[in-house]
Amino acid sequence: TISRYFTKSRGKALSTGWFGLSTAEFILPVLIVYLLTITSWQNIWISVSILVLIFLPITSYTLIKNLNFDSREEVKETEHKEKDIFQWKRIEVLKDYRFYIICLNMLAMPWIATGVFVYQSFITESKDWGSFVIAQSFMVYSILSVVTLLISGFLIDKFTSRKLLIFMNIPLSLSTLVLIFFDSSMTSFIFLGLIGISNGLANVLGSSTWAEIYGVKHIGSIKALSTALMVFSTAFGTALFGLLIDQGYSIEQIAF
C-alpha cells in the first residue's frame, strides 16, 4: 500500500512503516526475558494470543477507517514521474531476467538470517557466548535495524532503490566473516549488529525496488510473488542449516 500511494517520499514512508516491527524486535526480547522471571512461558503465549485477538482488529479498524485510497502523493512536473514507468504485469515480470537477479540479492538476507535465528542456540554453544550475551546482542541488532531503516528511507528518496541495492548484503557478508574468524563474546554484538544493518536495508528495499522498476499498478501481485519466494527461501535455509548441523559441520564451516 505504501509503495503504491507514495512516490516522492516512498523511502521515508516505508522506513516509518517498518519502524514498528524493528522497535518491537528491540522491546519484546527484553520484555519476554523479564516476564519469564515471574511466570511460565505457557502463560506468556496465552496472554499474547489474547492480546492479539482483542487489540489487532480494533487497532486495524481505527487506523484505516479514515484513509482515502483514491489519492496519491503529488509529484511536481519537474521531478521524476512514475506514470512514465511501464506498468508490468506479473506474467511479464516472470519473463524478465532482472527479477531473478534482484531476487537472489534480496533472498540472501531472509535465507541466512532465519537460519541464524532458528539455530542461535547452536551458534551460542559453538562460540561459548552464553544465552545472556546473545539476548543482549539482539538488542544491538534491533537498534541498528531501526537506525538503518530511518537512514535508508532518506537515501532511497535521494538516490533511488536501484543504486542502493548493491550495498544491501555487504554487512551480511561481513557478519559471516566475523562468525568464521572470531570467537570472543564481544563479536556476538558485531555479528548480529551487521545482520541488523542488512535487515534494515532489506525491509525498505524489498518494497520500494519493485515499485521503481515495475511500476505500482500491479505491485500487489508482484510483491506477493517475491514474498512467496522469500518464504520458500527461509524454509529452505532453515532445513539446510539443520541438515549441515546434523552432518557434523561446525558453525565456521556453515558460515563459509
Predicted regions and their residues:
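Cytoplasmic helix-loop-helix junction between adjacent transmembrane helices
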Residues: 1-19, 215
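Helix-loop-helix hairpin linking two adjacent transmembrane segments in secondary transporters
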Residues: 21-68
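A late C-terminal transmembrane helix in Major Facilitator Superfamily
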Residues: 25, 216-248
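Flexible cytoplasmic inter-helical loops of multi-pass small-molecule transporters
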Residues: 64-87
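Extracytoplasmic gate region of multi-pass secondary transporters
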Residues: 91-152
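Helix-to-loop junctions at the C-terminal end of transmembrane segments
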Residues: 148-160, 245-246
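Structural signature of the two symmetry-related core transmembrane helices
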Residues: 163-178
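Paired small-residue
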Residues: 186-194
